[in-house]
Amino acid sequence: MIRNATIEDVPRMQAVINSHAELGKMLFKSYAELYEHLRDFAVFEETGEIIGCVGVAIIWADLAEVRSLAVDEKARGRGVGTKLVHWCIDEARRLGIRKLMSLTYEQRFFEKLGFEVVAKETLPLKVWSDCVKCPKNENCDEIAMVRVLPEVPPSTHLTAPPTPRGISIPVLMEMEAE
């Protein structure tokens, strides 16, 4: 069953996320990061054990990110990841967010869920704030994907501006250092 994450879930969430980070599939998460963003996360619990988790990070009024989608290796292939992404889609709808994005290596998985590949440059600069912590930031090989939720009306707020031309992830590192 999927439920909102609680303080008690953080150690297991970190273990599942960081097992994928060790393989270079996502960023490591500290306890502090998970506690700070706990309200953004859901967990998949089965027979009292957390076997997966995911977060929805709001980027802008019209865009949220599927973040830290991780499923325990023992539970892979059983639809846990799909159910967690559906939770993200439902959460975006509930919040009135029209677009959901992911930076991923699992293109086919997300395509099956209605996501489409987009140019990274079409995403707002704020998306790249985590990239300064990534060892691959200068050679990012993740695929940017977006799913538009047509049933959610367009936001009346400003939409997030795309990354300006000429700005690249290495420039973000220089900007962060200032």
Model-derived regions: residue spans:
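A conserved beta-strand-loop-helix scaffold within acyl/acetyltransferase catalytic domains
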Residues: 28-41, 45-46, 51-71
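Conserved active-site alpha-helix within GNAT-family acetyltransferase domains
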Residues: 94, 98, 104-133, 138
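A short, acidic/glycine-rich surface segment
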Residues: 26-28, 52-53, 126-132
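Short amphipathic alpha-helix that is part of the acyltransferase structural core
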Residues: 1-28, 45, 142-144, 151-178
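Conserved acetyl-CoA-binding loop-helix of GNAT-fold acetyltransferases
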Residues: 71, 77-94, 102
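Small/polar loops that bind or transfer phosphate-bearing groups
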Residues: 5, 101-102
